[in-house]
């Protein structure tokens, strides 16, 4: 069983939660949108509404306690990049970030991502 932090509870984030939940992993979801949090609640053990670009908010989650952190933010690459970087600064063990293009993947890998996925 792994402790997983899922930042971004949109379509891709919800899909990840749906895959991890039946395997017994403990998943915490974070999003700025209450509706998306409500949609992912059946598949996670905990969820919070918050800004993942805020270092104090992330620190309050206990980043070092998660085995893996997924950054699945879509539509705002700047927020995804900032979140990825902050996670590593705060002691994240392993960060998987979402990219839509190769140039985004390069930036993410240079700024803290251990792995990059292309969901579409």
For each of these PLM feature ranges, what is it?
Residues 1-120:
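Cytosolic regulatory regions of ion transport systems
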